Amino acid sequence: MALGLSRHGYRRLLVFLAYPYWAGIIEAQWTPLIMASAFFPLLLPATLAKPQLGLPVALTTPTWRGVLACTVLITLSLLVMPRWPWLWAGHFYLYNRFVPLLIVPGPLLALALLRYRDRDALLLLLAALMPQRWFYDTFILWLIPKTRREFIWTIFFSWGAGLYRWYHAPHSYVEVGRWMVLFMYLPMLAVVLLRKAAEKPSIATA
């Protein structure tokens, strides 16, 4: 992931200071590898490990090599265990979750549609539509910042959720979702909306 980030400027390495990165590392999550797949197409099959997080990345950074790699992996997995999609779907109702867009003030994230031609806005909106459960799930949002200022401010706000988690045990996933929206999603929305049209790069370029 560090190699992919540094290809477009060392300022992107600031992402390792974001609270969701450390939350994911502590819990041994897939999110860093899913983010890396945005820079290395052959890693795109990693998005299949957590489809609810991988789908926004896969849809906003598609390449023929990545799609081919995913197709091969899915085909092989079906040959080994043909029933796995039904087994996976059968456990979905057990997944404690929330959808950021549906938790107040999450509906504000629909404002990303004002920048519908910007792939960063699309990534933000797709992520907000996906079921999530903890702070590390937002790490893919750090594909959105491009400038040093954008990284610094979004990282700063992310630690608001970190401090909250440190001093307060959330009572529900809805409560977790509200703090995720406030400290991760809304700052990213501000980045997308305030970025000048001439400064709108693609997700994987700077």
Model-derived regions: residue spans:
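Primarily membrane-embedded glycan-assembly and transfer machineries that use lipid-linked glycans
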Residues: 1-43, 60-206
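Internal transmembrane alpha-helix with an interfacial aromatic "cap," most often the third helix
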Residues: 45-60
